[in-house]
């Protein structure tokens, strides 16, 4: 998801208007909503200091905006390819045996990454069986990683 779309999604999730966000960033009354609309549409890119302030206002981890983000499957594949170049043993690809179609599984030989994936899986399972709401799931993602990580997959 591109930066502007992330800003828009989180702003709307927080029930904040473009004008309100713009005013809280210090833009004038007449230009506040216009500036935010430009950020969200990709016409303008906020400076790093502005992104930090947007994250504070929207109460999310700033990494939601500062990390480059992967907007397409092609970009995801390129990222995985370069990670594979840096560490040839990191990924293990395999065909899932229980599938009638060709579905490829991927594991990463990195304990930290696996703990992240297990944590995510735990949240998705809770979402799937109704133990958490869509809002709670998004809220968790917006604040990930927490300073004191809780591995919830053990209680699933």
Predicted segments with their positions:
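Short, charged, amphipathic alpha-helical segments
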Residues: 134-142
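Charged, helix-prone or intrinsically disordered regulatory segments positioned adjacent to compact structured domains
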Residues: 49, 56-131
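Helix-turn-helix DNA-binding elements, focusing on the entry/boundary residues of the two helices
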Residues: 7, 18, 33, 48-51
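Short basic helix-loop element that most often maps to the first helix and adjoining turn
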Residues: 5-25
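Recognition helix of helix-turn-helix/homeodomain-like DNA-binding domains
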Residues: 26-46, 67-70
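Short amphipathic helical patch at the helix-1/turn junction of helix-turn-helix
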Residues: 1, 12-13, 45
């Amino acid at each position: 998801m591109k930066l502007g779309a992330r800003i828009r999604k989180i702003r709307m999730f927080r029930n904040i208007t473009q004008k309100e966000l713009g005013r809280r960033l210090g833009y004038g009354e007449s230009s506040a909503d216009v500036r935010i609309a430009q950020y969200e549409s990709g016409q303008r890119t906020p400076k790093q200091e502005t992104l930090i302030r947007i994250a504070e206002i929207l109460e999310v981890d700033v990494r939601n905006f500062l990390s480059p983000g992967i907007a397409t499957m092609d970009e995801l594949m390129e990222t995985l390819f370069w990670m594979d170049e840096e560490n040839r043993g990191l990924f293990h690809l395999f065909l899932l045996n229980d599938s009638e179609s060709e579905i490829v599984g991927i594991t990463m030989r990195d304990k930290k990454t696996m703990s992240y994936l297990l944590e995510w899986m735990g949240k998705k399972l809770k979402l799937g069986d109704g133990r958490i709401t869509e809002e709670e799931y998004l809220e968790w993602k917006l604040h990930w990683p927490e300073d004191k990580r809780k591995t919830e997959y053990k209680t699933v």
